[in-house]
Design a protein with these regions (language model features):
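Acidic/aromatic-lined carbohydrate-recognition and catalytic surfaces
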Residues: 1-350
């Protein structure tokens, strides 16, 4: 895939701006590229197609370096505890920020700049970081969420990558405008992984099963994997407060009796409802393929997914309007079920 990407980049050299700004750190190994003009501000101006092509050829194509050593060849791989991780030097990265740059020097990071290119990070831009990471001794790159995420009730302009909408699709915003529509975001991710493996860097992906987007695609087939409240009561939904504690506390088992005696906790637990499929399976099946599944459920069932919030008791921040918790168990916690008057109450977040 790297060769295919490089062929496309080479075909576009000379057909774009010569003032595409990049940090000079990215130019390692290609400092002598004719199209590079270095500035006093630590940047270089260049033809983006010429730069990325030269970078790929220098570090990833014209090389005799071996790819990342298979884990099966690691002497300690089969020992208890994941020894390959213990030996690794790991760098954590969020693509859209780690590889972001003000490429047109406008003073703003733009989703589409005056050259027609996005300035947030992409898999292609991440390739430019790999040589420097390798020089730092990094041999494992831990990728924070790269899946499609929800933008419903998003916080900020872009939304949270921790509000995953679909665990089986990559985030299209990580595709680079420099590559044509003949390349998918999956193709560009493959090229990035190929590049990393070529210089001995492994890729680890953060799957984050704890949280989901409030309108996760999994709702269509597994509404019972989520927590539900009445949509008409969402404005009343808030983090419960336990008067017996004057400050935030860790949710330890020894404190649970006091927590469940709190009137506000009782109010909170009673807000939860059974999932829409459990309430009316026929109706749910008739709407499950709606373009906006959560909107359809809110209209037909007056239900919505319960926003997540901090685990700590009396933690001040409000609920997170853009993410919901993924239900990991099909029963109530054994440490707290003794405090429930009705063991058959709907699943709840606390």
């Amino acid at each position: 895939m790297l060769k295919k990407v490089n062929r496309h980049l080479k075909s576009k050299i000379g057909k774009s701006t010569q003032a595409y700004a990049i940090p000079d750190l990215w130019t390692k190994g290609v400092h002598d590229l004719e199209t590079l003009q270095f500035t006093k501000s630590g940047e270089a101006l260049t033809d983006p197609y010429a730069f990325y092509s030269a970078l790929i050829e220098k570090h990833f194509l014209n090389t005799e370096k071996k790819s990342a050593t298979p884990l099966s060849n690691r002497k300690k791989h089969h020992a208890v505890g994941g020894d390959w991780l213990k030996e690794s030097i790991i760098y954590s990265s969020m693509v859209r920020t780690s590889a972001a740059w003000d490429n047109d020097r406008s003073g703003f990071l733009e989703e589409k700049n005056r050259f027609g290119f996005k300035e947030t990070g992409t898999f292609l831009k991440m390739i430019a970081l790999l040589p420097s990471l390798k020089d730092m001794g990094i041999d494992t790159l831990y990728m924070l969420p790269i899946m499609v995420y929800s933008t419903k009730h998003k916080k900020g302009e872009l939304g949270s990558p921790y509000g995953v909408n679909d665990f089986f699709k990559l985030d299209d915003s990580l595709k680079d405008d420099l590559l044509s529509e003949s390349f998918t975001v999956e193709d560009e991710f493959k090229a990035f992984v190929d590049a990393a493996h070529t210089i001995g860097i492994r890729i680890v992906i953060d799957i984050i099963p704890r949280t989901n987007g409030i309108d996760s695609e999994l709702i269509r087939d597994h509404p019972d994997w989520f927590y539900w409240i009445k949509a008409s009561e969402k404005h009343k939904y808030k983090t419960p407060y336990v008067d017996a504690f004057s400050e935030a506390k860790a949710p330890l088992p020894k404190r649970m009796k006091t927590v469940y005696e709190s009137e506000d906790v009782k109010r909170h637990i009673h807000m939860f409802e059974h999932n829409p499929k459990a309430q009316d399976e026929t109706l749910f099946e008739s709407i499950k393929e709606s373009p906006d599944i959560l909107d359809a459920i809110e209209r037909h069932f007056d239900l919505t997914t319960a926003p997540a919030f901090s685990d700590n008791i009396n933690d001040p921040p409000p609920p997170w309007s853009d993410v919901t918790f993924f239900r990991r168990y099909m029963d109530h916690p054994k440490e707290t079920r003794t405090y429930l008057k009705d063991p058959d109450i709907p699943p709840y977040i606390l």
